[in-house]
């Protein structure tokens, strides 16, 4: 994992970007910094007293734990689960045993299929998984944040049309209201040995317009 970091994200911004009662899609290409950003999200929610469950399907749990802030009062606010290929049924079993107001899944494409949906192709499975996660968030009034890896492509310069270029198996309305895209300009440049890590935009697309939350990616 790239041990770069983001500047401190404020709770107000995180609370707006990832509301309760729905699944939020945190999407970016490989190497942009999705996991580091997701850990910062977990840190903020834990710091403000929200019990957080972090499913890390790509990395060892020790890599995640090493980047979590210690909680001053000694209470463990963040639980890490690194069991590979978890399914929606596995998530349901965990949250039945303990309440979590925040669930982060890093990342959803590595989840196992829903057992009752055997026979579907992977694209249809992923659509059902996202819809089921959204239903789970609504029924329990919790935040579910699903990290999603996009195919690395060169964007044509118009970030507003980016949602139309990714995750096309999801309904347009569903995707528009839930997707948050990490966009780092130099990630798409031709410079292969640049050491500069510039600003990162968090782009949202609700209500037919985009909002950009600029943050800083640092070493």
Regions found by a protein language model. Name each.
Residues 1-72:
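The Walker A/P-loop phosphate-binding site
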Residues 4-11, 85, 161-165:
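Short gly/ser/thr-rich secondary-structure transition/capping motifs
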Residues 5, 48-135, 195-197:
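Conserved inter-motif catalytic segment of the P-loop NTP-binding fold
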Residues 14, 131-219:
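Phosphate-binding/switch region of NTP-binding enzymes
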Residues 21, 49, 100, 176-177:
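Short, well-ordered alpha-helix to beta-strand connector turns
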Residues 25, 102-104, 145:
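Structural motif
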Residues 29, 55-57, 81, 105-106, ...:
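Generic beta-strand/beta-sheet core signal
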Residues 33, 60-64, 110-114, 152-155, ...:
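Flexible loop/turn segments at secondary-structure boundaries
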């Amino acid at each position: 994992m790239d041990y770069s970091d983001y500047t401190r994200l404020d709770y107000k911004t995180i609370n707006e970007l990832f509301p309760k009662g729905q699944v939020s899609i945190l999407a970016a290409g490989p190497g942009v910094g999705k996991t580091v950003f997701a850990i910062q999200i977990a840190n903020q929610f834990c710091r403000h007293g929200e019990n957080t469950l972090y499913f890390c399907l790509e990395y060892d749990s020790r890599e995640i734990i090493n980047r979590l802030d210690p909680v001053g009062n000694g209470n463990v606010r963040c639980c890490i689960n690194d069991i590979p290929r978890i399914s929606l049924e596995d998530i349901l079993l965990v949250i039945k045993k303990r309440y979590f107001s925040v669930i982060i899944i890093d990342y959803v494409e590595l989840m196992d299929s829903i057992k009752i949906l055997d026979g579907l192709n992977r694209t249809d499975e992923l659509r059902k998984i996202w819809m089921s996660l959204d239903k789970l968030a609504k029924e329990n009034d919790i935040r579910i944040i699903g990290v999603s890896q996009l195919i690395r492509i060169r964007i044509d310069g118009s970030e507003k049309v980016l949602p139309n270029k990714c995750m096309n198996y999801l309904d347009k309305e569903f995707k528009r209201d839930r997707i948050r895209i990490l966009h780092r300009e130099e990630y798409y440049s031709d410079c292969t040995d640049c050491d500069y890590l510039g600003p990162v935009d968090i782009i949202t697309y609700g209500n037919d317009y985009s909002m950009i939350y600029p943050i800083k990616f640092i070493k």
